[in-house]
Amino acid sequence: MPSSFDLLGEMIGLLQTEQLTSSWACPLPNALTKRQDLWRALINQRPALPLSKDYLNLEDAYLDDWRASFVPVSVKDCQKTNYTSLFLYHGDIRYLAVDAIVNAANSELLGCFIPNHGCIDNAIHTFAGSRLRLACQAIMTEQGRKEAIGQAKLTSAYHLPASYIIHTVGPRITKGHHVSPIRADLLARCYRSSLDLAVKAGLTSLAFCSISTGEFGFPKKEAAQIAIKTVLKWQAEHPESKTLTIIFNTFTSEDKALYDTYLQKENNCE
């Protein structure tokens, strides 16, 4: 069985042969981390075009190795809150072994094309594998238009521990601008649409990232308040959904502190 180092080298070679990205002419690095960065840069930039079976077999083997390098996080590993069906998880959403994780997508729905970018969309697409971008391309081709803010789409999670990914596009907030009622409602729609889709798909566990708080600039405090209020209201309106366990995933210490505070007791997100 080839090592991850060798698999990366072979994948890089095949991707560079295509000459489809700006990194196609970079020399093959001798360090593992540098190879990982170059492979990720190449696959991040690659258009949503069919891939060869040879490449996909290599990627499958590499991502299987990645998947075996950590212990997945289940609901029982998550932090309990004062609500029996709401949990907190502080860490990397890619490690969650739940029915579905929510991805903060953009309107193209094809993942992030910026090489090695730190956004959640980039991380999820990279380590779910290239089949995810192709699946999203099929959705967008059938739809025939960009994805609207506040909607939700379901795909397989491919190489991630989760079974599915729910993709939703949140609203943007320009730095220094206040959160208008329209944008607050659009963010709430992201949560409602994702919850509705999860129930429609028969899912029993769903992990939300902090939608719109990264690259899209939504203030973290207001976003956390909207997320929790929307989920609690949705649960009250859908008593039949009590079997759906909901996890709020936080990645920064600021987000964790906000969710810890707001989930201490009912209606504590004013």
Swiss-Prot record:
SMART domains to which the protein is assigned, alphabetical: A1pp
Residues at which ADP-D-ribose binds: 92-93, 106, 119-121, 212-216
Gene Ontology molecular functions: hydrolase activity, acting on glycosyl bonds
Binding site for Zn(2+): 112, 117, 119
EC number: 3.2.1.-
Function: ADP-ribosylhydrolase that specifically reverses the SirTM-mediated mono-ADP-ribosylation at an asparatate residue of GcvH-L, by releasing ADP-ribose from the target protein. May play a role in the regulation of the response to host-induced oxidative stress.
Protein name in UniProt: Protein-ADP-ribose hydrolase
